[in-house]
Amino acid sequence: AKKQLEIFSDEIIEFITLNNYVLIKTSPGFAQSISYYIDQLQMKEILGIIGGNDTLMILTSSNEIAEFVCYQLFP
């Protein structure tokens, strides 16, 4: 799944952490595919993912964990 995320890296426009969330803005039509591959990583730090058309939100347990998840996904 990590390899598939690398393939989609050009479609990720920006990402930020906000409290215990990671918000990722993508090119239109790519958020659900990217959220699927992030989910396939089965990171225990991720409590859930919601993907729309061009935005996805990752729920974690704390701000620190959200920053850790960002670092793991986008080194």
What are these regions (language model features)?
Residues 2-70:
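Non-DNA-binding regulatory cores of transcription-related proteins
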Residues 71-75:
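Compact structured core domains
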